[in-house]
């Protein structure tokens, strides 16, 4: 009977032509699924479902308000943003019941081990977070080049009541150019810092997994690699047309805003829940996994025990929920905004829509294999990243549309 009801609701959604009625049917469908999730999880999932539905409803309202005003918003159909969200919520429901069992089945760890010897898991522990730093660094390079190119634009002489600009105004223009150049250089320094953090974290994970120590040469090589990557990024951007750079600025805004919001939420939730990692229980020979808590429960025992201290563990073991690696990998979702900014062929679009989510899923799976996170940890990180991306994309594209209309009006 449950599946017949689902089928009838889905049929009504597809057959309804009126947008408002379709939203009503869709809301009812989501609430029905939420009610089912609440029942199977004994009401413990209720609060989370309500929050997610409210966020989804907000996104739908934004789309309704700007429908017809923004051509991009017409492409954001219901299935585009709702289907992945519903799937992730369903995964959270599954994780609420079988989180520990799934980790026991997938984690490649023996009792007493903290770092898994699994090559797949180790590989993505090293490179999993790289996208957030590389994309943010490249976005700052875009801003730097955009600011620098403004100083190269020809100055147009203006008149007011038959009088041209005075020498004083020309001197002000020179000061403005200097300020722009200083700003461009500052952005390059910050971009280089992001690139350096990417290499630093990658090397740190490698050293940690192999129980090695760093040295001055490694630090120097990281700095040189970051400078070289920044130089390459700027060289590529300077070879592009001014119009392309202007469009890439919107991509940079989406990338930086999405990454900042996602990681701020994820890092803010970690100390609130203080969830113990699966591999921390394995390292202390806790075969009963007595330290396990469900994702919706706060861990009251968030201080290191004697056994954990003797095992060489740190307070990082209490940062399981949500997954930082998965949140960092979720920054690749900003690449999905490129089809809205540039005209691209179908092959490129398909590659973006397949490879970006696939990378996030692979990183999430690798974190479970390493015993660093549970299914609910990585799923929540994906959900937060996806919601943040949709909200930032919607707002940014609306602002871009208004800005474009204003520019065309001034012409």
Predicted segments — roles?
Residues 74-85, 296-411:
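Membrane-embedded catalytic cores of phosphoryl/pyrophosphoryl-handling enzymes
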Residues 96, 142-157, 232-243, 337-343, ...:
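Structural signal for the C-terminal ends of transmembrane alpha-helices
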